[in-house]
């Protein structure tokens, strides 16, 4: 399995670590720490040196209760950072955005993946993504970032997320985005309580029936904090456990804050999976 963008390819026969680069003042874990262009590029460099093969640049906090950001502000935050990384490093760049303007401009300056928590549901986003020809990550979220954690409710979380993916894949294909350009993210922590999150993690491998890359993001999230009763800065061990559980089930991309530790954990996973006669990766 491979992804293609900007004249390059990403081989998904082994798990990739995606380093989180939030250029926001209010992200739940690292808001305000990489706001200047120099700081953002420095942090990207550190993550790449630690083994990240994808950098995920986000200019709008999507934590529960987060305020919305204007198009102009998000463009000012994101585009210079994407351009600077693209010019300096041989790394894939993902842009965490829902806005069509940011999708288009990111593609022009070198982004490889559109990572949209709203699955191209904003007006014009679907058309913008189709125009760029870039791979798109579709994520499941119940509600919206402001309200999603108020009282999430499912009869069957896996079945509902699975049905959502079926609908969104069809919607993308109708808009001219080929299925092989899509990635899937169950959306851990987005409109889900503790039970929903762990039931999805336990059944993650079942999403392979789509034959699409799976991206997961559980790093430092409340599904770990609530379980262990610790704050965001003390969630490394829980984050690594989630990353390993996902990768052992064949997750292709693990989105994290702590790159070095996750890369080391993935080496252990790869050694274990390659020792099996029947590998889970193709």
Regions found by a protein language model. Give the residues of each.
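Extended, charged alpha/beta regions that create polyanion-binding interfaces
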Residues: 1-2
């Amino acid at each position: 399995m491979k992804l293609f963008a900007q004249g390059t390819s990403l081989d998904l026969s082994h798990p990739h670590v995606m380093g989180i680069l939030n250029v926001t003042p209010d992200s739940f874990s690292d808001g305000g720490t990489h706001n200047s262009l120099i700081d953002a590029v420095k942090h990207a460099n550190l993550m790449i040196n630690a083994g990240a093969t994808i950098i995920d640049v986000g200019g709008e906090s999507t934590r529960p209760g987060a305020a919305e950001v204007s198009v102009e502000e998000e463009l000012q935050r994101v585009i210079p950072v994407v351009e600077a990384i693209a010019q300096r490093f041989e790394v894939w760049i993902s842009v965490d955005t829902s806005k069509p303007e940011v999708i288009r401009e990111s593609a022009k300056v070198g982004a490889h993946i559109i990572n949209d928590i709203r699955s191209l549901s904003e007006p014009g986003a679907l058309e913008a993504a189709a125009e760029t020809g870039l791979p798109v990550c579709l994520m499941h979220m119940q509600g919206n970032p402001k309200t999603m954690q108020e009282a999430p409710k499912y009869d069957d979380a896996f079945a509902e997320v699975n049905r959502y993916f079926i609908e969104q894949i069809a919607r993308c294909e109708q808009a001219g985005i080929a299925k092989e350009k899509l990635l899937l993210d169950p959306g851990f922590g987005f409109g889900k309580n503790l039970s929903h999150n762990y039931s999805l993690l336990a059944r993650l491998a079942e999403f392979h029936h789509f034959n699409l890359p799976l991206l997961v993001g559980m790093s430092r999230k409340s599904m770990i904090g609530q379980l262990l009763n610790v704050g965001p800065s003390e969630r490394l061990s829980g984050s690594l456990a989630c990353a390993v559980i996902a990768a052992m089930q064949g997750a292709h991309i693990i989105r994290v804050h702590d790159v070095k530790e996750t890369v080391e954990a993935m080496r252990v996973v790869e050694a274990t999976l390659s020792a099996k006669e029947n590998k889970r990766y193709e």
